[in-house]
A protein has these predicted regions:
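Conserved beta-strand scaffold positions in the cores of enzyme catalytic domains, especially
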Residues: 25, 77, 134-136
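Conserved core of the sugar-phosphate nucleotidyltransferase
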Residues: 118-147
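Short beta-strand segments
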Residues: 6-7, 110-112, 137-140
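Conserved N-terminal catalytic core of the sugar/cofactor nucleotidyltransferase
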Residues: 2-5, 13, 27, 31-110, ...
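Active-site glycine-rich loops that stabilize anionic/oxyanionic intermediates
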Residues: 10
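Short alpha-helical oligomerization interface
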Residues: 19-23
Length: 147
């Protein structure tokens, strides 16, 4: 199983906070969001590679992060070549880019790099194997006002 962490957005709605730092590298607690994601990925024994897809503006920051990331599997950072919001590929385009670039023909987990979550990826992958079907995880909010 391979994993793609989508981190190629420009986060312009969060400027100036994200003017020089991608959302996935912003801290929650004492570590970047992406560290929380990789920590969850470390529980998935089937996982043998993590691909972080970024843009040209932030790829070097992710490459620096990957050098010290606490991962049980190799992390590869891919630069999708985009330079701003006007030429970004979008989530589906970046997934396709990574699949083509890395020639992935394996089960694939895709996670947005700016999403903080507390559920178990191990349990989610176990569910995936049990159902033997593609799976999508969503959060249902009972109280719309809480959104």
């Amino acid at each position: 199983m391979k994993a793609i962490i989508l981190a190629a957005g420009y986060a312009t709605r969060l400027y100036p906070l994200t003017l020089h730092t991608p959302k996935a590298l912003l801290p929650i607690g004492k570590k970047p969001i992406i560290d929380h994601i990789v920590e969850k990925m470390n529980t998935v024994k089937e996982l043998d590679a993590i691909y972080v897809v970024s843009n040209d503006k932030f790829a070097e920051q992710f490459a620096d992060w990957a050098k010290t990331a606490k991962s049980h599997v190799p992390i590869t950072v891919l630069n999708d070549g985009t330079t701003d919001d006007s030429n970004k590929r979008g989530a589906i385009g970046d997934i396709s880019f990574v699949i083509d670039e890395m020639q992935i023909a394996d089960d694939l987990m895709v996670i947005a790099g700016d999403n903080f979550f507390t559920y178990s990826l191990k349990e989610y992958v176990d569910f995936f194997h049990e159902k033997n079907r593609d799976c999508v995880c969503v959060k249902v909010w009972e109280d719309e006002a809480a959104l």
